[in-house]
Amino acid sequence: MKGDSELKSVSYKLIVPLKIQAYERLVLYIERIQFPVLVKRVFHPGISRNDFQFSILQNVQDEFEHNLAQRLYVSESTWQLILMAKEEVLQNVNAVFNDNPDADIAMIAQKIASFENPMGEKAVVNIKNEFNSL
């Protein structure tokens, strides 16, 4: 039917810009939760251990909640990688604080900044692949 194909064409034209925006926002989210970026954004001289830990965790969660609706526009596999990237960051940050109870805050900041986020990298690759298949 001609009407069905026209409807699909119009839907495609409406959805594609939203999908592209979702891809952009989720790549930006992954970039913003990279360890060195988080440390640079949150750390300042004189910050307490508790405030530093809380601020990093809160930043990751706030960024995630801000981008939650993007789930509508990406595949389930991409969304799962986004979730795993977020969890990887939260777990690593908590582990540094728990494993180094007597370390000074500068050492903790340096240690956190040196981490990599392989799940984040996988998520970005997945997003790029989805984008390229539009």
Regions found by a protein language model. Give the residues of each.
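Conserved non-transmembrane functional hotspots
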Residues: 1-134
